[in-house]
């Protein structure tokens, strides 16, 4: 039980995912967060950034035994991550397409909460197909927007285009940001804990803003009704 709890904790830590699971676990986590409804808690943004940073610091390192080595060339890393992200969204879309009605009547659980579907629905109705592109940069939203696109039966060709474009910008922006920062400041590889905390805070800001905007709108609507 103790081992299982430690394993779950490691899944929240980007550095641990990369160090213990390498490229294989990294790709699986990106796939799961973008394609499986219970993957919403996984640290996609910070994971991409840290992967880019560790790739850069590994290239700069002269130590064979460095704990921060992540020997995956950036030209292999980015296409691999993109493939996982695109495939994940296709799985989410198909899942929503086939189980939409059942999903909306399903009871809430630790792995699934309908409020996330409604959050994705609100985001989708405001921005249309662009929600699939922009949603890539928002935790939770990026997990449930492709599922909702399947529920509303968005045309597959359109979804495929939005999926690829969104995945490309999400993967390349965050991974290359980490990569070039690591090239500029290689010492950051020794202070990953601080980097991860900063990234988590930054990634949660858009979700918090959206949440409070929705709350304010609901309060305003109730006030107008009275």
Where are these regions (language model features)?
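Hydrophobic alpha-helical transmembrane bundles that constitute the permease/transmembrane domains
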Residues: 140-144, 164, 168-171
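Transmembrane alpha-helix interface/packing and boundary motifs in multi-pass membrane proteins
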Residues: 27-48, 203
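Membrane-interfacial helix-loop-helix
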Residues: 1-28, 53-147, 151-154, 158, ...
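Transmembrane alpha-helical segments of integral membrane proteins
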Residues: 171-182
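Pore-lining and gate-forming transmembrane alpha-helices of multi-pass membrane transport proteins
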Residues: 163, 167, 194-198, 202
